[in-house]
Regions:
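Partner-binding and oligomerization surfaces adjacent to conserved cores of proteins
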Residues: 1-275
Length: 275
């Protein structure tokens, strides 16, 4: 895993911040509900493009059939129940205030990355850094595709149907794809400098719940933080642009009763007004 920044920031509304402290958790939402409409599909599209390039250069009928079947099987990967909780390496970001917080009612919660990784790991979540550069994404995708093809060709029994062989064996390669695909985002989002907690959670897992989204119900999984006993997790609370900075700051001190906030409360310095 890449060395994470000392502190990662979760941008949310005042209601969301209350929810974090009241439930002692952050919520990881189903990846397909994120504001990037191409979430997860981006890596699938890139993999299919590369597989198509390899297929065009291969005259072996069995190899071509395996390649095409693997490309088709990516639809099954897209249906995996992958959940993500999002953070930014930037503490006071205009794009984050505008994108993830309601007008005049935004907060960011600063959490120590190493400690966040420690508490989330036993719950099935990894802390990963998002990749926006296509030049960095491509080798990862190509390595996965080449390895999968090599293994599928090597294990194809004599006289066996290549398509059925791929259908039987391709789930072995899904975890590898699911490990990197949630980190790959369109470069239009690079200013977010995003890190994520990522986990695969079956649909029948009792932790799965529903919350109200802007236009639909969104499945989510709470990731327990242990704020009352963990003295090393919370770094700060920052209040976003609001017409009542002093009142908002005074009210936020009540969170000190719930958890140790090591660097106290900060105020956004961005001269932005959205009320």
């Amino acid at each position: 895993m890449n060395a994470q920044p000392l502190v990662l920031h979760h941008y949310t509304s005042g209601t969301g911040l209350l929810g974090i402290f009241d439930s002692d958790s952050v919520w990881a939402s189903l990846i397909h509900s994120q504001n990037d409409t191409k979430e997860f599909e981006h890596a699938i599209d890139e993999a299919r493009t590369y597989l198509s390039t390899l297929r065009a250069a291969d005259a072996d009928a069995a190899h071509m059939a395996i390649n095409l079947a693997l490309s088709t099987s990516l639809d099954r990967i897209a249906r995996l129940n992958i959940y993500v909780a999002c953070f930014s390496a930037i503490e006071d970001s205009l794009s984050q205030w505008r994108g993830y917080c309601p007008p005049g009612f935004g907060y960011s919660l600063g959490l120590f990355g190493e400690e966040l990784e420690r508490v989330a790991g036993p719950q099935g979540f990894r802390l990963v850094k998002c990749i926006y550069d296509h030049a960095e994404q491509r080798p990862i995708i190509e390595q996965w595709a080449e390895y999968a093809l090599q293994e599928l060709r090597k294990t194809l029994p004599a006289g066996a149907d290549p398509v059925q062989h791929v259908n039987d064996k391709c789930p072995l390669f899904f975890p590898g794809f699911a490990a990197f695909a949630p980190t790959m985002k369109d470069q239009a989002f690079r200013d977010e400098c995003e890190w994520r907690l990522v986990g695969i959670v079956p649909s029948n897992d009792p932790r799965v719940r529903l919350r109200a989204g802007k236009s639909m119900l969104v499945p989510y999984v709470p990731i327990d933080l242990g704020l009352a006993t963990n003295q090393s997790l919370v770094w700060n609370i920052r209040i976003g642009p609001t017409p009542n900075m002093e009142l908002a700051s005074n009210a936020a001190t009540h969170f000190f009763r719930r958890a140790r906030v090591r660097n106290g409360i900060g105020l956004s310095t961005i001269p932005y007004r959205d009320w």
